Design a protein with these regions (language model features):
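Ligand-binding pockets and gating/stacking loops
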Residues: 1-408
Length: 408
C-alpha cells in the first residue's frame, strides 16, 4: 500500500463494516447536525497560471479567473503545491491526482488507494451510494482508485446518472440482479476454498479474500436500500446542444448538487478529462489539448482562456447554488468540502509543480489566498482533509505533515 500505511489502512478498512451497522441509526443521526460531504474536481489540463493566481497576495479580486466568484469569502486558493515524483509523468500524472503515487508513467506502475475512497470507507455507509464518480467522457478511468490500485470507472452519461439517482427501478429486475450477484459471490467463495486446499500463496489468498469482502459489502448495501424509495427531484439538466462540452460540465455539477442535497451520497469525484478534437464553448472553438500547448502565444492563450473561464463559470454557479441551500444552521456549502484543482501546473510544458488548488466550503475559516513554501506536497493538504473528516492516519502519499490551515 504505497499511499497509506498498512496499519492505517486496516484501521480505515475496519470502518466499512461498522458503517454498514450504522445504517439502522440513520434516522437518529438525521436529527443531529448535518453530515460532512466532500467533492474532488480535477481539470486535467490545468489553468493558465498568470490568469488563475491573484496578482496581489491574498486578494482574489486581482485574479483574472477568480475575481467574479460569488463565494470568495468561503474559499481558499493554495499556491506552490506539487506531487513529488512526477517530473516525467506528463498526462499520466492525472492517475495520481488523488493518490500521490509517484511515476505513473512507469510500465510497472501500481497506483495506491485514492483519497476519495479512503473517505468513502468512513463516510459512505449511511447513504444509498457510498460514493459517486463522474467524468466528461468514457475512457474507463478517472481519478478514483480502489485499495488494489485498480481504476474505478466513472459515469459520464448525465441522463443515466439522473436515472440511477432519482428514477424508480424495476423492483423485480433489481431483485433478480441481486440474486445473480449473490450466486457469483457464492462461486467466488467456493473458488477461494479450493485455492486454500491447493496451498495457494498467502498474498494471492489475501487479495482474493479482499475482493470477496468488498463485493459482499456492496451486495449487502444494495439489499439494504432495495425497498427504500429514491428521492424525487425535478429534472433540471440542460439539453443545450450548441455547447456540448460546456453543457456536460454544467450538468455534472448539477447532478453533484442534487446528490448532496438529497443525501444520496457524501463523496463525489468529477474528472474533467480532455476530449480529442475541437470543442465549442461561448466565444471559442478549438481543441482543448492543442490550445493548452500555447507556447505563450497571446492569440492561443486568448482561446484557451475562454475554455477555462467557461469551466470556472460552472464551478462558480455550483458553489453559489450550494450556498443558497439551507442545511441545518448553515448552508449545504458550509457542510461540503469542495476541492478543485489539477494534476498539471503548466500543461503547455507538462509540468506537475505549482498545482492550482482551491478548497471551498466545509465550514472552514478561509484565508482566500495562501502562498505556501515552494514544493509543498499536495498530500499535506490531503492529510489535513482526512483529519478534518475524522480519519486518524499518520500519513498519506508523500505527506510530510498536516498543514493545519483549514481551521473551523
Amino acid at each position: 500500500m504505497r499511499n497509506i500505511s498498512r496499519k492505517d489502512f486496516l484501521k480505515i478498512g475496519a470502518a466499512l463494516p461498522l458503517a454498514m451497522h450504522s445504517l439502522s441509526l440513520r434516522a437518529e443521526q438525521g436529527k443531529k447536525r448535518p453530515p460532512k460531504r466532500i467533492i474532488f474536481i480535477n481539470s486535467c489540463l490545468g489553468f493558465y497560471k498568470p490568469y488563475f493566481y491573484p496578482k496581489k497576495r491574498g486578494d482574489l479580486s486581482t485574479s483574472d479567473y477568480l475575481k467574479g466568484m460569488k463565494t470568495k469569502e468561503k474559499m481558499t486558493v493554495f499556491q506552490n503545491l506539487f506531487h513529488p515524483g512526477m517530473e516525467t509523468s506528463n498526462h499520466d500524472s492525472e492517475k495520481s491526482f488523488l493518490t500521490g503515487t509517484p511515476s505513473p508513467e512507469s510500465p510497472t506502475f501500481v497506483n495506491g488507494m485514492s483519497l476519495d475512497q479512503v473517505l468513502a470507507r468512513q463516510m459512505g455507509g449511511d447513504t444509498r451510494f457510498p460514493f459517486l464518480n463522474f467524468s466528461i467522457y468514457d475512457r474507463g478511468w478517472g481519478i478514483s482508485w480502489n485499495d488494489r490500485g485498480s481504476a474505478i470507472p466513472p459515469m459520464h452519461d448525465e441522463q443515466k446518472i439522473f436515472q440511477m439517482l432519482f428514477e424508480k427501478e424495476d423492483l423485480k429486475a433489481k431483485k433478480q440482479q441481486l440474486q445473480n450477484d449473490q450466486n457469483i459471490l457464492d462461486c467466488l467463495r467456493r473458488d477461494l476454498a479450493q485455492l486454500r486446499k491447493q496451498g495457494a500463496n498467502a498474498g494471492k489468498l489475501e487479495s482474493y479474500q479482499a475482493v470477496i469482502a468488498e463485493l459482499e459489502t456492496q451486495l449487502n448495501h444494495e439489499k439494504f436500500w432495495l425497498n427504500t424509495s429514491k428521492p424525487k427531484v425535478p429534472k433540471s439538466l440542460s439539453d443545450d446542444q450548441e455547447f456540448v462540452f460546456s453543457t456536460k460540465i454544467r450538468n455534472l455539477f448539477e447532478l453533484a448538487k442534487l446528490a448532496f442535497r438529497t443525501d444520496s451520497t457524501r463523496v463525489i469525484t468529477l474528472s474533467m478529462d480532455w476530449i480529442s478534437g475541437a470543442i465549442k464553448v461561448p466565444g471559442a472553438t478549438g481543441a482543448w489539448h492543442t490550445l493548452s500547448h500555447h507556447a505563450n502565444k497571446p492569440n492561443i492563450i486568448a482561446q484557451l482562456s475562454k475554455i477555462e473561464i467557461d469551466t470556472l463559470k460552472h464551478f462558480n454557479r455550483f458553489l453559489f447554488e450550494m450556498d443558497q441551500i439551507k442545511d441545518g444552521e448553515g448552508t449545504l456549502l458550509d457542510h461540503t468540502t469542495v476541492v478543485m484543482g489539477s494534476n498539471f501546473g503548466d500543461a503547455s510544458n507538462h509540468t506537475c509543480d505549482f498545482l492550482p488548488m482551491i478548497v471551498a466550503g466545509g465550514g472552514y475559516k478561509h484565508q482566500t489566498h495562501t502562498v505556501l513554501e515552494k514544493q509543498t506536497p499536495l498530500c499535506n493538504l490531503y492529510l489535513e482533509l482526512l483529519h478534518k473528516h475524522n480519519i486518524d492516519v499518520g500519513s498519506f502519499g508523500s505527506s510530510q505533515k498536516d498543514m493545519g490551515l483549514l481551521n473551523s
